[in-house]
Amino acid sequence: MNTFVVVFLLLTAILCHAEHALDETARGCNRLNKKCNSDGDCCRYGERCISTGVNYYCRPDFGP
């Protein structure tokens, strides 16, 4: 019984990690605080590509 639980949790963790990786490559978007070139090609909905002085990063867009 204990072995079954360990194997089940291991498989669940592997599947969740694989699904997360596929989701990011399918979107072509970077996660929050990653470098970007423009709003359209890397930021998720509700984020903007904002300059931090040297580089640009996707940050939440709270309006104008």
Swiss-Prot record:
<dbReference type="GO" id="GO:0090729">
    <property type="term" value="F:toxin activity"/>
</dbReference>
<keyword id="KW-0108">Calcium channel impairing toxin</keyword>
<keyword id="KW-0732">Signal</keyword>
<comment type="similarity">
    <text>Belongs to the scorpion calcin-like family.</text>
</comment>
<keyword id="KW-0632">Potassium channel impairing toxin</keyword>
<protein>
    <recommendedName>
        <fullName>Toxin BmCa-1</fullName>
    </recommendedName>
</protein>
<feature type="disulfide bond">
    <location>
        <begin position="42"/>
        <end position="58"/>
    </location>
</feature>
<feature type="disulfide bond">
    <location>
        <begin position="36"/>
        <end position="49"/>
    </location>
</feature>
<keyword id="KW-1219">Ryanodine-sensitive calcium-release channel impairing toxin</keyword>
<dbReference type="GO" id="GO:0015459">
    <property type="term" value="F:potassium channel regulator activity"/>
</dbReference>
<dbReference type="GO" id="GO:0005576">
    <property type="term" value="C:extracellular region"/>
</dbReference>
<keyword id="KW-0964">Secreted</keyword>
<keyword id="KW-0872">Ion channel impairing toxin</keyword>
<comment type="function">
    <text>May increase intracellular calcium release through the activation of nuclear inositol 1,4,5-trisphosphate receptors (ITPR) of cardiomyocytes, thereby causing an increase in the contraction frequency of these cells.</text>
</comment>
<feature type="propeptide">
    <location>
        <begin position="19"/>
        <end position="27"/>
    </location>
</feature>
<feature type="signal peptide">
    <location>
        <begin position="1"/>
        <end position="18"/>
    </location>
</feature>
<keyword id="KW-0960">Knottin</keyword>
<keyword id="KW-1015">Disulfide bond</keyword>
<keyword id="KW-0800">Toxin</keyword>
<dbReference type="GO" id="GO:0005246">
    <property type="term" value="F:calcium channel regulator activity"/>
</dbReference>
<feature type="disulfide bond">
    <location>
        <begin position="29"/>
        <end position="43"/>
    </location>
</feature>
